Amino acid sequence: MSSTFFTCNCCVIQFKTSDLQRYHMKTEWHRYNLKRRIANLPPIGAEQFAEKLQISEKEQAENQVDEFGFPVLKPVMNQSNALPQKQKKPIKSKRGRKVGTNLLKRKDRDIAKEKQNRSVSPSGSISSQLSNLTVGTENTNTDYGEDTVSEYGFTSDSNYEYATSDEELDIADKPSDKENEKITITECIYCGKDNKEVERNVKHMFSEHGLFIPERSYLIDLNGLLEFLIKMIVIDHNCLCCNFHGSGLESIRAHMASKRHCRLPYETKEERQLFAPFYDFTYDDHSISKNLQNDRAITSKLSSVYGAKNDEEDGEVDITLVSSENDINANYTTVSIDESGLELTLPTGARLGHRAGQRYYRQNLPSQPNPNESRRTITAADRRMVSGVTEKQYKKGMKKMQQLEKNAINTQIRREIKRVNFQTHYRDELLQ
């Protein structure tokens, strides 16, 4: 009689009892094989999994970080400390022991002198905690060196000078003026390319990055607009289209390129007000007065044409609108008004009607047919008017036409009889 086994299909192993199988299901080896099975990979054995686990633990121990994300600095063992205790040769002779004690006493005297000098000198407050930790007696149980802090990964010689006053700290925190002068109005704001000229720079930003300057004809301060964009994007690292604030120049450039925000927001009233100092939408008084005079002349002419009850002039009335070259609507247009004063013909041939006749303009009346064409249609439909038809053929056609009419009437009668009982609440009085 064969004994029963409990099998794990994921790890391809067998167990004698169900308890062992349940315990196996909770192990990391089984979970790892489950993930491999989901990824369509074959399972691995326990020995191979143990090797992978040791490698991962070793990597984690080497790449340890503290709570702030900085790597944990481990002490570097000296060559003497790196050797095991068995390899160190013990001092057996009495002379050697005396030399060792003399060296320790001399070391203690040097340490005492150094402490005295530190207490007298004014630089005692600058001494770090690491220097205090390295000073110790022979009974101090430590693996670190006594004179340097190179065990922590630092060098004894430092190339940096520490700022001791508040003014030096403020100067160190403030960005240098050279960084602000890196971008000029001839350089691209979004990639930093130097185009040598302002107009070439604007064309480059429009073609490569999509920077469109709205209402360019009213722009009076292009250099000021570019300086404003440099201040907002390059110096302050702010996006004009959203509230994103970049950590640096490359950060804000990458954001604006990925989000397609290399443009000027000019849709709402608040956004237009932001760029208002660089535009001028006012006209000189001469052009304004000339436009008013032209408008009044056109209005009076049209009112006289539309309001006239009896037309004394023959032909059409031509109105020519010629404006000055400096006007915003500088063009030459000729329009024609018919005798009724309700239609205006454009140079393209299109006709514009007065709103008083919109009821008639909306009608879609069919055109009058040509009498010759209508006569031909009747002739083609009635074969009696065609030459060459005999009386016998005519009578035969009449009989056939009458038969078709009779069949159509009978079909209609049959359909009407069937539809009588289609009523919802129909009650036949004869059947009651």
UniProtKB/Swiss-Prot annotation:
Keywords recorded for this protein, A-Z: Cytoplasm, Metal-binding, Repeat, Ribosome biogenesis, Zinc, Zinc-finger
Entry annotated with the keyword Disulfide bond: no
Zn finger (C2H2-type) location: 6-30, 186-209, 237-261
A cellular-component GO term for this protein: cytoplasm
Leftover remarks: Present with 2240 molecules/cell in log phase SD medium.
PANTHER family: CYTOPLASMIC 60S SUBUNIT BIOGENESIS FACTOR ZNF622, ZINC FINGER PROTEIN 622
Summary of the function given for this chain in its UniProt record: Pre-60S-associated cytoplasmic factor involved in the cytoplasmic maturation of the 60S subunit. May act redundantly with REI1 to directly promote a stabilizing structural rearrangement in cytoplasmic 60S subunit maturation independent on the REI1-specific ARX1 recycling.
Protein name per its UniProtKB record: Cytoplasmic 60S subunit biogenesis factor REH1
Gene it is expressed from: REH1
